[in-house]
Design a protein with these regions (language model features):
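Conserved donor-binding/catalytic core segment of Leloir-type glycosyltransferases
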Residues: 40-69, 82
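Acidic donor-binding loop of glycosyltransferase active sites
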Residues: 121-139, 154
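A charged, aromatic-enriched C-terminal amphipathic alpha-helix characteristic of glycosyltransferases
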Residues: 180, 189, 193-214
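A short, active-site helix/loop in glycosyltransferases that binds the activated sugar's phosphate group
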Residues: 1-29
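Nucleotide-sugar-dependent
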Residues: 131-147, 159-168
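Nucleotide-activated donor-binding/catalytic signature segment of Leloir-type glycosyltransferases, i.e.
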Residues: 93-120
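Glycosyltransferase donor-sugar binding loop
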Residues: 77-96
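Short beta-strand->alpha-helix junction loop in the catalytic core
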Residues: 16-17, 26, 30-42, 55, ...
Length: 214
């Protein structure tokens, strides 16, 4: 695939990917913000913490499960993270079950349809949306799951490896929270802090995606 990319006009939705294509493969690309559609939503109750990305190696779901187990042990069952998303069975079996002895099923709420109604149902109760993605040669910018969470009033909790790029639009304790491991995540979820100002700051990230020409 890489050998043939020179024949096409390439568009990337994150600056890190654009840079990687150029420096690694000498492939030019154009960076464009991905557009966002303002679908109908219900008022956010802010009662839960959710994780909605794939359950996979680069998503670090094990950190979330470890944090949940600690929270339960400390009597904070109401603060655990509900986990949604498609499973990578290899990750679940080899990493979670065999290597780490972690039980995803204790917190797994299943998949949801990729439509606005189901998306709204999951996010309408979410005070926090946890996405611990850390992908080699990627990060710093946004993705659809981030924008959906911001749009519905859920504050993002992100992996520090995602935002370590100096050009990242995400700033810890300004428009998101940043954690490096389960201990950081536990501390944050135990506090269950007020996020009104942070939610408003995050909304500013959404605005450029509402008027994008492709």
């Amino acid at each position: 695939v890489i050998d043939n990319l020179h024949r096409f006009k390439i568009i990337t939705i994150r600056e890190t990917v654009k840079k990687h294509l150029k420096t690694t493969f000498n492939i030019k690309s154009q960076f464009k913000l991905h557009p966002f559609y303002e679908y109908d939503i219900t008022k956010n109750t802010g009662k839960k913490a959710v994780a909605m990305s794939r359950i996979d190696f680069d998503k670090h779901t094990d950190i979330i499960i470890n944090a949940n187990n600690i929270l339960i042990g400390d009597g904070k069952e109401d603060n655990i993270v509900d986990i949604y998303g498609a499973k990578n069975d290899l990750y679940v079996f080899h990493r979670l079950q065999n290597k780490l002895q972690l039980n995803l099923d204790d917190f797994y709420k299943g998949t949801f349809k990729k439509d606005f109604d189901d998306l709204n149902e999951v996010l309408s109760d979410a005070k926090f949306s946890i996405d611990l993605s850390a992908i080699h040669n990627d990060g710093g910018g946004s993705q659809y799951t981030f924008l959906e969470a911001i749009y519905q009033g859920a504050v993002l909790i992100l992996n520090n490896k995602w935002v370590e790029n100096k050009k990242s639009v995400f700033k810890d304790k300004y428009n998101c929270f940043v954690v490096k491991d389960e201990n950081d995540l536990v501390k944050l979820l135990k506090k269950w802090p007020n996020v009104t100002k942070m939610r408003n700051n995050a909304k500013k990230l959404l605005e450029p995606h509402l008027d994008v020409e492709w």
